[in-house]
Amino acid sequence: MYLKKHYKNLITHEIEEEFKKNDIPILDIGDSIKMSILIHEGNKQRIQNVEGVIIAKHKSQLSTTITVRKIVQNIGVERIYLIHSPLIKNIKIVRKAKVRRAKLYYLRLRSGKATRLKTKFN
């Protein structure tokens, strides 16, 4: 029983390693990022640039997701992205921030200058 389970884990691990992206930067909570995403509109494809602050990160190997928040026309917009998705072409870190929380959901309740985060200098 144990060997069967272990063998199954090895097989799934090999398959996941095939589809993982290796060129992803180390993303932390509070980072401001700019991403290029492939959008399909009918039979056309185009690349859309998205930027925002990472407010949450859920690690689960191949299905690791990040939640990105941005204010658009005074409305907070949040989207969840799969990091290893083939639709994400590029991820660039614009600014790193110093935060003390694993999830920044409290930013939903704030507006204006209260949503600013302390910049981390290396």
Curated annotation (Swiss-Prot):
**Has the keyword Transcription been applied to this entry?**
no
Question: Which InterPro entries does the annotation name?
Answer: Ribosomal_bL19, Ribosomal_bL19_CS, Ribosomal_bL19_sf, Translation_prot_SH3-like_sf
Q: Which family does it belong to?
A: Belongs to the bacterial ribosomal protein bL19 family.
Q: Which domain of life is it from?
A: Eukaryota
**Keyword Plastid attributed:** yes
- Write out the annotated subcellular location: Plastid, Chloroplast
One annotated GO molecular function: structural constituent of ribosome
Listed HAMAP family? Ribosomal_bL19
A GO CC annotation recorded here is:
chloroplast
- Swiss-Prot/TrEMBL keywords: Chloroplast, Plastid, Ribonucleoprotein, Ribosomal protein
One record GO biological process:
translation
Matches recorded under SUPFAM superfamilies: Translation proteins SH3-like domain (SSF50104)
Species of the source: Gracilaria tenuistipitata var. liui
PANTHER family this protein is in?
LARGE RIBOSOMAL SUBUNIT PROTEIN BL19M, RIBOSOMAL PROTEIN L19
Name of protein: Large ribosomal subunit protein bL19c
